[in-house]
Each structure stands twice: as C-alpha cells, then as structure tokens.
UniProtKB/Swiss-Prot annotation:
PANTHER family: LARGE RIBOSOMAL SUBUNIT PROTEIN UL18, RIBOSOMAL PROTEIN L5-RELATED. Part of the 50S ribosomal subunit. Contacts the 5S and 23S rRNAs. This is Large ribosomal subunit protein uL18. This is one of the proteins that bind and probably mediate the attachment of the 5S RNA into the large ribosomal subunit, where it forms part of the central protuberance. It holds the Pfam family Ribosomal_L5e. One of its GO terms (molecular function) is structural constituent of ribosome.
Amino acid sequence: MAHGPRYRVPFRRRREGKTNYRKRLKLLKSGKPRLVVRKSLNHHIAQIIVYDPKGDRTLVSAHTRELIRDFGWKGHCGNTPSAYLLGLLIGYKAKKAGIEEAILDIGLHPPVRGSSVFAVLKGAVDAGLNVPHSPEIFPEDYRIRGEHIAEYARMLKEQDEEKFRRQFGGYLEKGLDPEKLPEHFDEVKARIIEKFESEGARE
C-alpha cells in the first residue's frame, strides 16, 4: 500500500466503488433534485433525492418489482423495456408529488449511449419530468419496445427450441410469448399512463 506525506486514503465509499465524490459535488451544486438511477443484473431502481446536511432525503422512488405487482409486467426486469417503464413510473410519481425537474445521477454506471439507465431517463422525460439531456443518448424506439428481444427469440426458436426454452423460460412460465414482448410492453405502458392520468383527472 502506498504511503508518505502526500498519500491520501480515498473515502470508504469511493474505495468500495459506490460513490464518485467529484461527480456528486457537481450534481449537488445544481441545487436540483437528483433522479438517481441504479441497476443490477435483474432489476432497476429509480429515486428522486434531495440533499440534506443530515443525510439525503428520498422524495419518491420506484422499483421494477412494482411493474410486476401493480401493472402485470411479465418480462425480465433488467432489460431496456422494463427500464423505460420504470422511468415512466418514477416520472409520473414525481409529477404527482409536485416535482417538475431533476438532474440525472447514474452514479458509477458508465454513460453508454442507448444503455438501460438512459431508457429510465427517457421514460421519466416522456412522463413530463424536466431533466436536462441530449436526445442522442436514448435507446432507439425499437429497443425500448423490446423488438430486438422478440426478433432474437423468434430466431432462436427456429434454430434451437431447447435453448429458446432455457433462455426464455421465465417469460414462458409467466404465460408470455417473448415474440409478443412489444405488444405486452405497449399494454403495460398504457396501464401506467391510465393510472396516473385518471388519478390526475379526479384531483
């Protein structure tokens, strides 16, 4: 381990690969709530967080598990379509809570164009949340709807049905033909929009 008068031990969360403090400081200086997006292999989570000297406060949050529980999502929760739907959900939740704008915080996730973290952003923006962005970073619409997944499933089924059933077993167990994923995406998206727009009309 390095040592000497000029050596500084990095903060613990930086050592653990959890926080980029330089980037965090820039986000805090904006003074806006942060749209915090995090992902794992099987799920995405989105939160609207504001800085507080005593500790960050979460104003609203959404998890891809809610897509399954509340809106009947049958697809995988770690893919691009589910990420977009999560963004739509957090965007509507934020608007309902009176939050009009935020700044994106993807933590240590690499800012890769078209990645699922930017699908979350796209969904939030489509819900009406004002987040500074460049449209070029969004995934293509066909990827947001899961058309690439449906096409791959179709090809795999024709070439190797056993492998198809292994890879898409989770879809099939829930009664979803992966070739119908784009249509299923449209149905779940419509349910999210209907829920929040009908609630807004009643208010």
